Amino acid sequence: QRVMMIDKAPLVGGHSALASGSIAFVDEKRQAAQGIVDSVDKFVADARVTGGSIDEELVRFIAEKSGEGLDWLQTQGVRFSPNIFRAYGGMHPRCVTAFGNMGARRYIFQLHERSRELGIETRLMTRAVGLHRFEKDKLTLRLADEKTKSEYVIQSRAVVLATGGFGANLALRMRYNPNLDYEIATTANPHGFVQDTATGDGLYLAKELGAVWTNMPNIVLLSYWGGRMLDYIGAEIYVDNEGRRFVDETTTTARIAQAILKLPGHSMYVITDAKSAKGVNVGAKITAGSIRLSNSVAEMARGMNVPASELEHTLEEYNKHASEKSADAFGRTVYAQTIDK
């Protein structure tokens, strides 16, 4: 059977190709080897906390099949890092990422290469603009070639919509969350200089066939700038424009986002040190200037334009709790390290 994959961008992968690449799973064999106790029920319970309203049946299915998913990816040539960690915004150590420094691009490139080996055709810069059923078991898909500005129609017995993100669709996202106005950039286009392809095309295509949109307000908000220096929790702090902490940095992404949106200018600084294991995107952020290196607290305070004494007090207070593994004023109890190097 002939299989064809289309992508409206010049490269495959969409936002997934830009992600750090953490994959959550439940697998007794993998987790027990590192002393981690987990279960499908706990996965579902954690999803209720981190995801808000969820399709519990779907989440349970994902959890039950997640170990098999990792196995399948490995059969396709994907290699994983050996350590299982608690990811940013997560509730339990159940994540791995691709081996090396490519993040989720490793998944995308490896699977794309495998698809080519299997004879699957890929058409880039090709947008799906219409999807209709014309017989009981046949569909018509109208495609727009972005290079030639022409349209054509193909027929198929099945169409898989592996898409649906709409973070770059300002009108649509504001319909469900009015706070996400033009000032809130997407992780794929934080500076507003490039095209972000997550405009919800797949949602509209599915709607043409009678699909119902659900859980649309559950838009994930991630702190782009320095907030993703690390892929795991416990080794960084967030401070406001006065050098003071304002949130438990190990809580859910939704709670962190709510706290950031209450700050003047919706901005914060993220601080870690030389001991932490940086994420795969840090090099690009240093080059872009969104992450800066400091040799001392005083130098860091000057760069942030905050009083050095305030920043020193913040770090001293954090390090005290980190050393004692004690709860702080924000309820934080998870610490991977002190921040002092």
Stretches found by the model and what they are:
Residues 7, 134, 227-231:
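Short loop/turn motifs at secondary-structure junctions and domain boundaries
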Residues 135-142:
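Short, hydrophobic/aromatic-rich segments at coil-to-beta transitions
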Residues 2, 8-121, 125-130, 134, ...:
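Conserved N-terminal/central alpha/beta ligand/cofactor-binding core
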Residues 130, 310-341:
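A glycine-rich dinucleotide-binding beta-alpha-beta segment and adjacent secondary-structure elements
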Residues 195, 199, 203-205, 209-310:
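An anion/pyrophosphate-binding glycine-rich loop and adjacent beta-alpha core
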Residues 147-150, 154-223:
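Glycine-rich loop(s) and the adjacent beta-strand/alpha-helix scaffold that form part
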Residues 6-7, 216:
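The conserved SAM/SAH-binding core of class I Rossmann-like methyltransferase domains
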